[in-house]
Amino acid sequence: MSARGPAFGLLLLLLCPVQVFSQSCVWYGECGIASGDKRYNCRYSGPPKPLPEDGYDLVQELCPGFFFGNVSLCCDVQQLRTLKDNLQLPLQFLSRCPSCFYNLMNLFCELTCSPRQSQFLNVTATEDYVDPVTNQTKTNVKELEYYVGETFANAMYNACRDVEAPSSNEKALGLLCGREAQACNATNWIEYMFNKDNGQAPFTITPIFSDLPTHGMEPMNNATKGCDESVDEVTGPCSCQDCSIVCGPKPQPPPPPVPWRILGLDAMYVIMWSSYMAFLIVFFGAFFAVWCYRKRYFVSEYTPIDGNIAFSVNSSDKGQAFCCDPLGAAFERGLRRLFAQWGAFCVRHPGCVVFFSLAFIVACSSGLVFIRVTTDPVDLWSAPGSQARREKEYFDTHFGPFFRMEQLIIRATNNQSHIYHPYPAGADVPFGPPLSRDILHQVLDLQTAIENITASYNNETVTLQDICLAPLSPYNKNCTILSVLNYFQNSHSVLDHQVGDFFFVYADYHTHFLYCVRAPASLNDASLLHDPCLGTFGGPVFPWLVLGGYDDQNYNNATALVITFPVNNYYNDTEKLQRAQAWESEFINFVKNYKNPNLTISFMAERSIEDELNRESNSDLFTILISYAIMFLYISIALGHIKSCSRLLVDSKISLGIAGILIVLSSVACSLGIFSYIGVPLTLIVIEVIPFLVLAVGVDNIFILVQTYQRDERLQGETLDQQLGRVLGEVAPSMFLSSFSETVAFFLGGLSVVPAVHTFSLFAGMAVLIDFLLQITCFVSLLGLDIKRQEKNRLDVVCCVQGAEDGAGVQASESCLFRFFKNSYAPLLLKDWMRPIVIAVFVGVLSFSIAVLNKVEIGLDQSLSMPDDSYVMDYFQSLSRYLHAGPPVYFVVEEGHNYTSLKGQNMVCGGLGCNNDSLVQQIFTAAQLDNYTRIGFAPSSWIDDYFDWIKPQSSCCRVYNSTDQFCNASVVDPTCIRCRPLTSEGKQRPQGEDFMRFLPMFLSDNPNPKCGKGGHAAYSSAVNILGNGSGVGATYFMTYHTVLQASADFIDAMQKARLIASNITRTMGLEASSYRVFPYSVFYVFYEQYLTVIDDTIFNLGVSLGAIFLVTVVLMGCELWATVIMCVTIAMILVNMFGVMWLWGISLNAVSLVNLVMSCGISVEFCSHITRAFTLSTKGSRVDRAEEALAHMGSSVFSGITLTKFGGIVVLAFAKSQIFQIFYFRMYLAIVLLGATHGLIFLPVLLSYIGPSINKAKSLATQERYKGTEREQLLNF
């Protein structure tokens, strides 16, 4: 017994390993039909069987680990074919990461073919099956337990969890796990793949996870590969996109700039407040010190505190003139004589002057027949040579212009959500109001009705089919419609499709929707429905483009549906463009009139903004006409000086006022005509702004000229022409000063690269110059004729009628306004106690404006361009409220890159083996920082999808063996073979000739159920193949910006995209190359101006001020200090304009910049006349000279430019257009009020303090000029 015991124990030890590791199967071959085309496996408990040789290729392809010895397996060739077919979906999504796919294949190869199945597979249910061919009874395996090691399951999940699905910009597991990728883990992923309710598994397989033997079973716990490990010597680890371990730590955006604060308060406020307080202390300290000094040493308390002792031309202190004084006096004398002689000539020969003036007007205005009006927004807002324009031109010529867009945003009026209960188990899923089946049917009816809209153009019918974007045409002529209904193939029957029985609904539109939002490119929804998600047009419909109002990525919570009809745009083809516009017009009319109580619709067509702008302009035309009519009426009445009712029609100057207005309008017409002759296009902003500007300048000059004459007395022996010549000699230098300085400033403003400012400056400069020339010629002649009419007592307007003689005649007189300025306003303003208050208030306002200077917003809210009652306003509001994706952005690689070399491919691709700083990888990284970069999604990459498409493991790339022509994956033909062999070399990326040989096939391949990677729909326009097929030209990689609402968002998005592209160009080493990478989005051409608008503003206003300074210092006779004071005052007006812009919510853009340039010119009118009058005054003190200048010129400036413009501006407040209310009413009102207050209040006070000393040479010249006349006594008081 003792000998037999050890022998028996030894036998047990020898038998145990054989029992544990023996090779035994649980099935072999396929038997009965499970469901649809899916079959059960046949129960088999014997040893593995040798695989027939015709299956060797398959086992090498799918399960190379089993290809050894006599290849004895537990599966036959048909099971391998079934395995390959069933793995096509995971192959398309997970093969990007070889380690992930290797582990997955391990799981399924062990399940299907492992020669040791019985160790970890336990059959739990079978049924008999009679083979109809052999009539043999076999046993189907209906249910199975699969024992899987937890270590293996977790390692497989970890290797796959980061893998991207580029076509949907989702994690691939979100498409393969039956739930969101975030909720997916190792166990529920494997459970879902083995659940027959997923539509793919033929029967139920229950996975049991354990690392220890359980119930006598040894779990399958094969070795795995991490995503950062290579599967073999040839294949590298997964890319950074698909494996976060490879990437290292997630990049962090730079911290936002720290606000500039002092003591916790805004630094600008603190600095300007402190500066203002310091100024007040110094200023009032000096004021009271001088006041005390004067009280102590001077008897009279009314002696001016500026210390400028009265100087008279008759005083004994003649003194010596400064070196520049005689030069200035000589220049002034020369201008007086020149204009006096010219004025006398015009009065003596009115017919000749008026005739030649009319001839000049007609000749110049005739150029209007060649006028070209620029209405294209691109030309209006973007300079032809700008970076955005060059990039747009490159994109349009290589890929075609960006499509036109017709879009609807639809909400359900019933806000009730509903709950979906998944079968057989799972958390309840809420669905938003518009995702109820009934609402979807109604929306589909609307969508179909829009598809059937017809329009007429040139007696031809235009349908959506004629103009729409159909990427697969002519194979598939379906229009691209980005709509959630395309998940249901735009079909009522598919929407109603469901699978169930009397008790339960296993799958319906809810199931399909939840799958499609995760896999929009899928051709089989992997549920019991088996409906495709791919749109009928052959491309994916991304959920973020067709759903709105959801939270995070819970698309089922959507509160709005978005339907977009992309329409072809045309590059330089007006005929086709107008056909599209004709259909859009019918589309707008249809949706406007569409009624459905269950739907609320916001919509816009491509032409909507232009249509609404035209409607807005027409609706505000009446308001504008009233504005100008009020100004014209005021001018006509205010020019006359009525002394008595009996002489009302004699002393009125209605005809002269109308003539002056016509001269102003003629100067505008001449300017337009001259530039039309030379081919400079006109913009709408010129038409809107220049009449206002020229009217301001022209009216001011008219009032100064006429009122100076009215206050003048004809000298003894002086004729009318001599008197008017002398008057013109007095005022024309001032008119010339203001007009010429404005002209030079505007012409220099033409150097601006901002199209609106450039065009405005050219037209404005010419109009102001012509207006001045016509005023000193034609208007002077007409004034002489009107005075002759008045002297002959003839009625105004009807000059052939003579009024009654009253003996009064034409006498010099002072108007009420002049007397008010002279006797009340000027003395009050220049009181000793008033002047410091004025200085303190204006410096305070200036300090405030400087403090908010950097807070003025940049940009232009597009909704401001729309009328308040426009349907587009509702669309803009819905756009910002519901949409979750911004405009598409294309990262363009210009022609020149070598895609056929491995190095060139690694620079751009994002998959296996690609550089960690490749183009696609950098955009992917940017999308992870979407709040900072404003890149919302990973890019669609044609080159990565091409590499997946051409893999020999895939069924996508095949050619006919006999002809070497492309064979689509849907074709069943034994002569179709793989494009590349299933060898180590064949599995590598194609290079050189291979790359170019198969690329056209990829770009022409339409997606189908057997291959969803065909690139025709997605990439046919993204890749330019050179004419001879030798290489790849320009290409693009598309993604989307995040939702952009405010102008600041658009500007920042463009800046960040350019920064990314610049970094890509640098990392690719293309700085010295002939090509580069640049981003393009349709809005860049409109928002690029804002990148430099601050610099443009400084440049334009600086050039204008510089020009005004130079011209003024020359024309004012080298009065340098007076010029400095005038320019400082104008600069204060401009700075205060920014303060008003901040207070009134006016942003800085091309429109407001044009207004600022214009305000610079108009400010000259408010300041130059008074400054020049101050320098010419011969009164003793600065206070007296300021008072005289304000009395004589201030009244004309106030009655001319101020009251004229104020009356016209107030009417603009009633305009319907928001852009008129904000950029014209508000800014024009600010220009006039700030100009008037600075010119008529601040400037005289400033001159009274620090104005230049009297020009002694000019005062002596004045004495000589009036010696012996009645005016001599006026100079000596």
Swiss-Prot record:
UniProt keyword Disulfide bond present: yes
Keywords: Cholesterol metabolism, Disulfide bond, Endosome, Glycoprotein, Lipid metabolism, Lipid transport, Lysosome, Membrane, Signal, Steroid metabolism, Sterol metabolism, Transmembrane, Transmembrane helix, Transport
Residue ranges, annotated region (Important for cholesterol binding and cholesterol transfer from NPC1 to liposomes): 175-205
Reaction equations catalysed: cholesterol(in) = cholesterol(out)
Any one GO BP annotation for this protein: cholesterol metabolic process
Domain of life of the native organism: Eukaryota
Compartments it resides in: Late endosome membrane; Lysosome membrane
Record-marked site positions (Important for cholesterol binding): F108
A single cellular component GO annotation: lysosomal membrane
Lumenal side: 23-269, 372-621, 675-677, 756-759, 854-1097, 1145, 1216-1226
Region of interest called Required for location in lysosomes, as start-end residue ranges on this chain: 1274-1277
UniProt note on tissues of expression: Detected in corpus luteum, granulosa cells and adrenal gland.
Residues annotated to bind cholesterol: N41, Q79
Glycan-modified residues: 70, 122, 135, 185, 222, 415, 452, 459, 478, 898, 916, 931, 961, 968, 1028, 1063
Motif Di-leucine motif mapped to chain: 1274-1277
Comment text on domains: A cysteine-rich N-terminal domain and a C-terminal domain containing a di-leucine motif necessary for lysosomal targeting are critical for mobilization of cholesterol from lysosomes.
Descriptive protein name: NPC intracellular cholesterol transporter 1
Organism: Sus scrofa
